[in-house]
Amino acid sequence: MKRFLLNNGSEYSYEQLLASLNESDKYYLLYKQLDLYLFFVNLIKALANNAPLVLLDADLNETEIDGVNVAEINVPTKIVSTTFVNMEAVVEAVKTPTSEITIFTSGTTGQPKKVVHCVQTLMRAVRFGEKYINQVWAYAYNPTHMAGLQVFFQAFMNLNFLVNVFNKSRTEVYALIETNRVTHMSATPTFYRLLLPFEKVYQTVQRVTLGGEKSDKKLYESIGMIFPNAKINNVYASTEAGTLFAAKGDSFQIPAAIRDKFLIQEEELLIHKSLLGQSDSFKFDGDYYHSGDLIEWVNEANGLFRFRSRKNELINVGGYKVNPGETEKVILEIEGVQQALVYGKANSILGNVLCAEVQLVEGSTLTELEIRNYLKEQLQDFKIPRRIKFVDSFSLTRTGKIKRS
């Protein structure tokens, strides 16, 4: 039997999935479900039968989002359900629905916002074909958000095996990769940093993808040592637009075919509305959406650029605009640092005082003084945190990113 999903010790085949899809003429428009298999069954059933979906986090509370009738959550809806003869027929049905999927932003810096997509937008970057059919994917994202959906579609549309590693410990992740001979994985930089330190290498992994946050050279080097046979790439995707760019080193390239769909205004990336889902929260300048991402050109003629920061993350320190990502990047260069978060704390004189929380690699004896001495060599004084606090862990959003508010 061809394997579909391994989740918390339970394994499911595509044969079982087909039976689950055919056994009922009901599905859930609004579904809160912790069980990943049941979540995927409902997702596939809706799409294969051209029914709309609103994807909700299992731990969602009604104060977090607007526009959802709580009384309708987990209430079954009857549909005209197709009986499928095999999984290939299901895949074909999922390719062409006209129904809409409503998802919510991760809430990294504020209240989650609703965005409505068609399936074609969500599957814009999915690749099909013989070369993809034997891949084994480590599933390292929340399934209700953009990145999780895109990894799911890439695996499912090629009938690949998915191994759930989301919210697992470092030792559990490595055991699952080794036991199931994982070949592909996609996750946030925060997820990969949580895999450090490492004790051995994993030869079966062929491709590692990062997305959702800024990364750094030190992390790329660590990933290259853990997975020596893997190609490493970075992608730019958003809840609003889906996948748009792939990276070349630390730079992203706007494809020539859609270069006219982007503008740069005051260093901010603007995206044409034709590439977006639908949302009442979008802020447009004519036909272009303000992404909130600040960039710098590497080669404007070739469409190559680097991300600098999120516009709403810049911190006013005594009249200077500080990019916390720049300071974090330097802190992460220091041997013994696993993760770092830089933020502003309100101050009546300076506007904000720059602060940092630092998580050390297990066994590290790094001191605050050593961190400060290194930062003094690399950064201007106003970019150096006045307060540095050592922490054991960081709060994460539902999508696995560090929470910044």
Predicted regions and their residues:
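AMP-binding/adenylate-forming catalytic core of the ANL superfamily
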Residues: 292-383
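Conserved AMP-binding/adenylation subdomain of ANL enzymes
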Residues: 123-136, 144-184
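Conserved AMP-binding A3 loop
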Residues: 99-127
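AMP-binding/adenylate-forming catalytic domain of the ANL superfamily
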Residues: 380-401
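Conserved AMP-binding/adenylate-forming
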Residues: 20-60, 139-142
